[in-house]
């Protein structure tokens, strides 16, 4: 589709922008910037977007525009008309034809590169979906990434990558439609399109030495020695089974190659018709290396009816917080919440691992589904041989680990009742994760997470001696046993450039998790510093919830907006629930030597993606736009903007330690003290968390909140706190801090699951602080806004007092000449000025009560393309690290100068700023 609007219609849209369409269409110079276009259309009356909703690229003869009114398919506008680019991939959703994504739930744009001669715009969208709230047909493998590279001479290269079921197809260099065209005064010309063509090439994995012998005569045997492709052969029947999931990941096994399962989607099937028939005896065996313990039972191999779980009742306590008033009486009979399930009553057989790392054998013997669970606990990242047997003659079930008995059970001497369903490897029936925190934990499919090799079925019960020989036959050497071919799982933290600034990147975690996603080169953002070893990380694995990372790669977050109760949906509605990053996203708005501005946008959804406080007429519910103003001293101020017409009982802050695999909470958090609260007079209260949470925490008059990490750099939060609390419940014997692993990274419909091991990413929630409203509105686009300062520092709470004062009680500014002042904007940690001449001078009236600490000056309408000369008290600043500046484009396309000074003062500062032509 190539839509054109002739010049006769331009009059109707000439007021289309905060910068009018007639203005940006004739700008005359190459320039790209964020803005918000106001076309006057009816949908904009209720549009819950901020000042950076759209992108304009100005060229000599017109403007190339990415507008939310078209769900961001761009158009070219000149004096002669308006032309949309081709809709190469057809779009349809919950909106009108022109704006198929009604409120752009899944459509967004980012300006990933902007220079004097070239701009690159990234457009991501879901081409087809249906329904309302929640939407139907939403799938992480179906998103489309488009890039537009626009040069100053009007040439455009457009690349289109469409989501694929298999990650290798997504990554294939041939999975790309490339279109080129020219932007001319008379329209879009010289279009050429090259369609995608997949290469289909795959390299074979390198395996161990193949061991061909087998103890006994298996009636089914998956050797997993294919080493490449999407087929695994059952070697007895010769039947080929498709390896289902995002990728067939072949790795070195105990013999030849093994197959790695991702914990969610991976599965191999063999039809019951081609499978072995067992009746009076059975042996199931296989080699496994666990990456993370299953959420619940996961099979190594099974043939079962997969009778659904039946819920008998809910039991246990609710969550609570110390400091809450009017707490409900707790059920003292149950220590924790849990689901009481009816006894499983399946048909067939099953060998697998439970959610706590114990191997188990289950068999339908006569009329009873018998279960044998070993007391042996299996470690992670180590090869084990697991075997289970049943023998009708002896009436015994046995289980073995590494060739040794690990459990037995006497059962009736009856035949095995065989299931008519497919044999499955790696994945069974949908289950609820074990150890739920609350009722909003739902049934879903999960698979084994780790490596599987040499899976065999026998129609006889191998003896203990034969099981031992089977183990010895395939046993790897000690080094290989303890170092299976799996990625180590370490939270990603970027490149460590040693420079201050932000960059887009594609952060890697571990391969089977990375394979779940269809993102191109720019999904994530990292902000780094040149004078301290901390970072801000905005990563899709945490739903882009902003993370502060210290020198020991320990993560912390002050979290997000959250609502519940009367907002619709199931349980908590929060960005944490967008586990697939369907909707949450981040963009770099500013990136200069003086500061970085990052925009994080998200809807408040439950685990089924039901948006809170949804209005069917407008399509809008609760959305948040958070803006991070990050400076070279490692300090960030965030403006938290929540759009809502619901009950205003949202959460705005939750202090959390984010834990990577193999990080226990008590390896990251100090217990003596854990929390420090300070006021502006330098008084600090310190709270221990030795045997559990403190119950005497007092937030009165406190402005500084520090969580004590086992590192030099600790996370701090500064604000006009109106109160707060400490998590006082949901503590288990795993740690003195409450710890859960339903988030981050986990792809499961749950808003609460207790951690039992440090096998997965997890988090420990510690505190809440309550903040005053900074701005609000109750009109057609109702919102609340609050602000907060945060960062990581090696300073004590007492040493943070000057910084807190400089922001909470900022020194006043007095203009002397050359500009007007809009005062100090606490939401940006910056003085706001409008230039009226080439030389500006003003006084910052610093004092003991209102000190200056590393101030920023934002000077709009800066007429010069170059940086400025600056003097303090008539002296120049010599060190470039003490004076940092940059020029950005405002939302009207004009220049803005941003200046940051590394200076602390309790005395007035005389500041003069001049263009380089002035001195």
Go through each PLM region and give its residues.
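Acidic-aromatic substrate-binding/catalytic surfaces of carbohydrate-active enzymes
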Residues: 24-107, 128, 494-584, 590-593, ...
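Short hydrophobic/aromatic patches on beta-strands that form ligand-binding or substrate-lining surfaces
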Residues: 221-222, 284-292, 386-388, 425, ...
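Localized edge beta-strand/strand-to-loop motifs within extracellular or lumenal beta-rich domains
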Residues: 163, 382-396
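Extended, loop-rich substrate-binding clefts of extracytoplasmic carbohydrate-active enzymes
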Residues: 96-152, 156-162, 568-632, 636-639
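Surface-exposed beta-strand/loop patches in extracellular or lumenal glycoproteins
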Residues: 179-182, 653-658, 704-712, 718-723, ...
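Short, aromatic/His-centered strand-loop micro-motif at the edge of beta-sheets
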Residues: 361-385, 442
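Extracytoplasmic low-complexity segments
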Residues: 204-265, 283, 293-298, 303-306, ...
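Flexible glycan-contacting loops in extracellular carbohydrate-active proteins
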Residues: 409-451
